[in-house]
């Protein structure tokens, strides 16, 4: 959640940045009206309180005590009434603020959508083939690695069954990713895939993205859309010691998304599924540590791709493509020969203190004061999309898939 004091004190500057993130101008106008109303009602409340304090002190020496008591009683009623008005406005303001995204960093390019993201660099060269490379779903069906028909039969569209070496390769990737991330200093944790609403709120999924979540009927439980949610919230409501930071964690999980806005996109294959697997990185840091830790996380995910021999590129997301909780995001896109283009395989984001304010994660700084931490997250990596990338990049003209050297010991 945004710092409402900063929003109020720097309204024009902050709302300009929010507009670049495509926040509805009507919401921003409503915020301005609420701030003005709140200021007016708080001023009135302070005047009533000042009256009460002043004349309460004079009551003992007043000549007409009964008259003054009556005035104080009447004024107390006004204080109660005015306090209610202020509370109603504050609650309305906070409710609107819950649906307002994070402010983009200064370094984030201003743009409308993904077409205005900025390429930072390319890593490794895409492979060349003396034949037309196939897409992963063609390879997967011919090798009996991917069973889309039975996936749909037992579930619905956008579900798939992994079989034989395809399932083994997926499991090998999970183990390799966890080991790689641990070698970079990330502690392995295993968390629930079902979390409560407060946890979903803490990382920013609720209330704004409620319709894209799978919820358990009659219970305050949701299937996670990323393990960023439970890992970050492990420390919700806590005050950490300065010495423990940064906390760097990695986690494997299944992820569940309705993909409500993806009709017609990636309808074939396993690029976009309702259930998929991911190995995540999450860090909790002091504010002054978050930029360097962001670079560590980005380097970890990029080096992991390189260790598998997968060509990829770094993209800085523009304001219009930036996620709700993120202040800055760099995507990693892997080269897919079958599609002849780069596709997203990881997003590394710095959320600054946005999630920490919602989840109430603080630490005691060197001055002994409680301060909000910074939270960061990133995929290292999306398992299904890495499987896709290996299938397409390591295919031969006979339609066989060769296993990258780094993974051979995991079979």
UniProtKB/Swiss-Prot annotation:
Binding site for L-serine: 226-228, 280, 379
Similarity section: Belongs to the class-II aminoacyl-tRNA synthetase family. Type-1 seryl-tRNA synthetase subfamily.
Protein's GO biological process: selenocysteine biosynthetic process; seryl-tRNA aminoacylation
Gene Ontology CC: cytoplasm
Keywords, ordered alphabetically: Aminoacyl-tRNA synthetase, ATP-binding, Cytoplasm, Ligase, Nucleotide-binding, Protein biosynthesis
Keyword Ribosomal protein tagged: no
Record text on subunit structure and interactions: Homodimer. The tRNA molecule binds across the dimer.
Coarse class of the protein's main subcellular location: cytoplasm
Binding site for ATP: 257-259, 344-347
EC numbers on record: 6.1.1.11
Molecular function per GO: ATP binding; serine-tRNA ligase activity
Regions crossing the membrane: none
Domain remark in the UniProt entry: Consists of two distinct domains, a catalytic core and a N-terminal extension that is involved in tRNA binding.
Name of the protein this chain belongs to: Serine--tRNA ligase
Source organism: Campylobacter jejuni subsp. doylei (strain ATCC BAA-1458 / RM4099 / 269.97)
Job of this protein: Catalyzes the attachment of serine to tRNA(Ser). Is also able to aminoacylate tRNA(Sec) with serine, to form the misacylated tRNA L-seryl-tRNA(Sec), which will be further converted into selenocysteinyl-tRNA(Sec).
SUPFAM superfamilies xref list: Class II aaRS and biotin synthetases, tRNA-binding arm
Entry's localization field: Cytoplasm
Pathway noted in the entry: Aminoacyl-tRNA biosynthesis; selenocysteinyl-tRNA(Sec) biosynthesis; L-seryl-tRNA(Sec) from L-serine and tRNA(Sec): step 1/1
Keyword Zinc-finger set for record: no
Catalytically driven reaction(s): tRNA(Ser) + L-serine + ATP = L-seryl-tRNA(Ser) + AMP + diphosphate + H(+); tRNA(Sec) + L-serine + ATP = L-seryl-tRNA(Sec) + AMP + diphosphate + H(+)
Xref: Pfam families: Seryl_tRNA_N (PF02403), tRNA-synt_2b (PF00587)
């Amino acid at each position: 959640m945004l710092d409402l004091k900063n929003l109020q004190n720097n309204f024009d500057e902050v709302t300009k940045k929010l507009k670049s993130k495509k926040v509805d101008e009507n919401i921003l106008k409503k915020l301005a009206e609420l701030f003005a109303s709140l200021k007016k009602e708080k001023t009135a409340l302070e005047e009533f309180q000042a009256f009460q304090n002043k004349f309460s002190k004079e009551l003992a020496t007043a000549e007409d005590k009964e008259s003054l008591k009556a005035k104080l009683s009447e004024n107390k009623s006004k204080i109660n009434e005015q306090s209610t008005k202020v509370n109603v406005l504050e609650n309305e303001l906070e409710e609107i603020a819950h649906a307002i995204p994070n402010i983009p960093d200064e370094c984030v390019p201003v743009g409308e959508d993904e077409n205005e993201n900025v390429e930072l660099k390319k890593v490794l060269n895409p492979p060349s083939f003396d034949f037309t490379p196939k897409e992963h779903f063609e390879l997967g069906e011919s090798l009996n690695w991917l069973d889309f028909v039975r996936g749909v039969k037992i579930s619905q569209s956008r579900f798939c069954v992994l079989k034989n070496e395809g399932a083994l390769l997926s499991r090998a990737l999970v183990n390799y990713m966890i080991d790689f991330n641990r070698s970079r200093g990330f502690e392995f944790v295993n968390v629930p895939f079902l979390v409560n609403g407060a946890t979903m709120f803490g990382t920013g999924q609720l209330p704004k993205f409620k319709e894209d979540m799978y919820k358990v009927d009659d219970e305050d439980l949701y299937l996670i859309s990323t393990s960023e949610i439970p890992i970050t919230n492990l420390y919700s409501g806590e005050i950490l010691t300065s010495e423990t930071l940064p906390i760097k964690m990695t986690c494997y999980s299944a992820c569940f998304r309705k993909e409500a806005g993806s009709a017609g996109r990636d309808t074939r294959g396993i690029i976009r599924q309702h259930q998929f697997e991911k190995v995540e990185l999450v860090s909790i840091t002091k504010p002054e540590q978050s930029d360097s830790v962001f670079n560590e996380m980005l380097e970890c995910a990029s080096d992991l791709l390189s260790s598998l021999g997968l060509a990829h590129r770094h993209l800085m997301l523009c304001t219009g493509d930036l996620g709700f909780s993120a202040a800055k995001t760099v995507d990693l896109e892997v080269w897919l020969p079958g599609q002849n283009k780069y596709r997203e395989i990881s997003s590394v984001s710095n959320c600054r203190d946005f999630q920490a304010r919602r989840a109430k994660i603080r630490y005691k700084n060197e001055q002994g004061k409680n301060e909000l931490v910074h939270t960061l997250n990133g995929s290292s990596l999306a398992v299904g999309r890495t499987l896709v990338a290996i299938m397409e990049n390591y295919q031969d003209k006979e339609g066989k898939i060769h296993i990258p050297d780094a993974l051979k010991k995991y079979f």
